[in-house]
């Protein structure tokens, strides 16, 4: 799952363990006296199915390759950037690093990750689409393998939508943003809302969905430097959300500071007709929905950019300090064989990036909305901020508070633009001197 769609509780549990184990890293006897190589693999899998699938694959590798042993180290999505930075700077990073593509830029430019360009097998590079490889390409190097991704979809109360008589969107005929706004109006009233936007972490949702409306926000000049420009296409999604909350009263104002999991009880109780969530939230719905609750997966609205949507795939990288890079890449090649990629995707309730894995019948079934998700795969693009140095600081110090204030009604669109552009460009400039 993407980082902002994981439960805090799960993050905390694995985070405590990760802080202890992370420091073991690459420095602990990578080659034994008997000549066997030991590689430490820090995995951020956290759902039970995902953890089990990953551990099983590690065990299978070790059984087949006794001369190259992989040790599974449990990591945590919570504060992973700071954890990795500390371990890299201390020379104690794991050999194989599980992360997300939007977190790699500083590590790649900082020399902490190995350039995999000449190490990756052709089977793997040809199976994963070029757009996915763009998400892990920084400068002239490739610093990770993108392997799982998830679109943002609408999880809907199927009965309520059917009773309302609204047109049900499909990937072939999605709602426009204007139609989506109108539908949420029709589904609202008597204390119920057409939609609940969980925007505790508003930046990735806003930026990634804005690709569908032609938004870009980050613009790279001929000199390679990036500037922020909040243009017409960037306005569509935030303006729609703001109007749903403030003008239409079709979106719940109380969920703006909530995480995705916090909205599920309201969805089950009929308070919200729809909730925009990451594709992997389907697992929680299957586990938590009351008996008899009927739900369906709908594509997010489309605009000038069609169904385009930004994603930050989960990635697997090799530490630059790892003394056994070829062996580490051989393990990645095994882990990401099509049949194994399917197992990882099913375990995390996400989409694989590999073409062969994506074609697997297990991921094409209508059950639990899998078919809707796979239909969106061709429209997924690297998140807008993918290669922007300084993005974490821009997001935390500028964009998050600005968007939160805008969605709450504390500031208007003009002030939002000013903060994102003026304050944001000051932050980015420090990283591009």
Task: List each model region and its residues.
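Conserved N-terminal structural module of periplasmic/extracytoplasmic solute-binding proteins
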Residues: 2-4, 11-106, 279, 304, ...
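Extracytoplasmic/periplasmic substrate-recognition and gating elements
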Residues: 63, 164, 243, 247-251, ...
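Short helix-initiation/N-cap motifs at beta->coil->alpha
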Residues: 74-83, 102, 173-181, 254-268
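Hinge/lid segment of periplasmic solute-binding proteins
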Residues: 101-153, 209, 294-298, 365-367
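Short, solvent-exposed loop/beta-turn-alpha elements that line the ligand-binding surface or hinge
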Residues: 114-128, 170-173, 195, 215-236, ...
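Extracytoplasmic/periplasmic solute-binding protein
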Residues: 143-147, 152, 178-227, 272
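Glycine-centered hinge/linker elements that transmit conformational signals in sensory
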Residues: 184-186, 223-256
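Long, aromatic- and glycine/proline-rich binding clefts that accommodate carbohydrate-like moieties
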Residues: 346-397, 405, 429-433
């Amino acid at each position: 799952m993407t980082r902002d769609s994981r439960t805090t509780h799960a993050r905390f549990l694995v985070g405590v363990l990760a802080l202890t184990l992370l420091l073991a890293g690459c420095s602990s006897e990578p080659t034994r006296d008997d000549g066997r190589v030991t590689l430490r693999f820090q995995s951020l899998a956290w759902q039970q199915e995902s953890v089990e699938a990953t551990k099983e694959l590690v065990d299978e590798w070790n059984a087949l390759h006794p001369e190259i042993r992989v040790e599974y180290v449990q990591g945590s999505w919570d504060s992973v950037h700071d954890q990795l930075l500390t371990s890299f700077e201390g020379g104690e990073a794991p050999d194989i690093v599980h992360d997300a593509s939007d977190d790699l830029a500083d590590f790649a430019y900082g020399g902490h990750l190995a350039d995999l360009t000449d190490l990756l097998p052709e089977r793997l590079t040809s199976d994963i689409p070029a757009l996915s490889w763009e998400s892990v390409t920084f400068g002239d190097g490739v610093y990770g393998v993108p392997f799982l991704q998830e679109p943002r979809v609408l999880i809907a109360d199927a009965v309520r939508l059917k009773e309302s008589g609204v047109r049900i969107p499909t990937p072939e005929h999605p709602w426009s943003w204007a139609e989506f706004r109108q539908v949420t109006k029709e589904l609202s009233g008597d204390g119920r809302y057409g939609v609940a936007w969980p925007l505790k972490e508003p930046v990735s949702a806003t930026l990634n969905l804005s690709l569908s409306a032609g938004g870009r926000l980050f613009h790279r000049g001929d000199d390679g430097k990036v500037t922020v420009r909040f243009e017409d296409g960037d306005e569509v999604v935030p303006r729609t959300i703001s109007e749903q909350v403030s003008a239409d009263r079709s979106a719940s104002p109380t969920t703006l500071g909530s995480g995705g999991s916090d909205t599920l009880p309201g969805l089950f109780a009929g308070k919200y007709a729809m909730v925009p969530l990451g594709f992997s939230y389907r697992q929680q719905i299957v586990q938590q929905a009351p008996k008899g609750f009927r739900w369906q997966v709908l594509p997010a609205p489309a605009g000038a950019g069609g169904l385009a949507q930004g994603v930050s795939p989960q990635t697997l990288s090799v530490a630059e300090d790892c003394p056994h890079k070829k062996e580490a890449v051989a393990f990645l090649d095994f882990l990401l064989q099509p049949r194994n990629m399917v197992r990882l995707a099913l375990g995390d309730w996400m989409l694989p990036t590999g073409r062969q894995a994506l074609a697997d019948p297990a991921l094409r079934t209508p059950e639990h909305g899998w078919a809707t998700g796979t239909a969106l795969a061709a429209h997924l693009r690297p998140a807008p901020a993918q290669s922007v140095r300084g993005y974490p600081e821009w997001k935390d110090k500028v964009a998050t508070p600005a968007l939160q204030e805008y969605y709450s009604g504390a500031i208007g669109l003009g002030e939002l633009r000013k903060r994102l552009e003026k304050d944001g460009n000051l932050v980015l400039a420090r990283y591009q001197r």
